[in-house]
Amino acid sequence: MKLKSVLYLLMLLNCLGLKSAHAATLVHGISTSWHSFSNSVSQTWNEPQTFDLYMPALTWHNRWTYDADKIDRYNERPWGAGGGMSRYDEKGNWNGIYLMAFKDSFNKWEPIGGYGWEKTWRPLNDPDFHFGLGYTAGVTMRDNWNYIPIPLLLPLASIGYGAANFQMTYIPGTYNNGNVYFAWLRWQF
């Protein structure tokens, strides 16, 4: 009986050790990712290559996820403006810090600010043509949520030529909420 108890104890300790190793690996991965993220934000802030003008262009509510009466009431022509700074890193990927304000679906002002990153491809012989896929992490505030700061992490995509870029994101959601395509023009100076 004692041998059986010792074996159970050894198996339990082994499992705890394995979980501890996995936890250490996870913590290390998160720490490495955070340092990479914060270094990219810091470098973009301290060493921008361009300054950017943001012009909201389009808001589209997914017709498969909204009632027609809601769509009829929503603003899908956001107007506003914003500014930012950006750089291309040593791998040719875009990094940007931005602040923008625009008229939301209810025609109320919505500010948004954050950091964006895109893996950038230049598939043609013309180096000015590019497209990218990445993410944006930031904060927004909306009138219908009493302008409480709301953190966000959203997909980001773009297509551009030279200094002109058309960037976009999709805000996921539920029925009659979220599920919005939002796009803007970004001009680099």
Swiss-Prot record:
One Gene Ontology cellular component annotation held by this UniProt entry: cell outer membrane
Domain of life: Bacteria
Reaction(s) the record says it catalyses: a lipid A + a 1,2-diacyl-sn-glycero-3-phosphocholine = a hepta-acyl lipid A + a 2-acyl-sn-glycero-3-phosphocholine; a lipid IVA + a 1,2-diacyl-sn-glycero-3-phosphocholine = a lipid IVB + a 2-acyl-sn-glycero-3-phosphocholine; a lipid IIA + a 1,2-diacyl-sn-glycero-3-phosphocholine = a lipid IIB + a 2-acyl-sn-glycero-3-phosphocholine
Primary localisation category: membrane
Residues annotated as the enzyme's active site: H61, D104, S105
GO biological process: lipid A biosynthetic process
NCBIfam families on file: PRK11045.1 (NF008271)
Record-stated family: Belongs to the lipid A palmitoyltransferase family.
Name recorded for this polypeptide: Lipid A acyltransferase PagP
Organism of derivation: Erwinia amylovora (strain CFBP1430)
Gene field: pagP
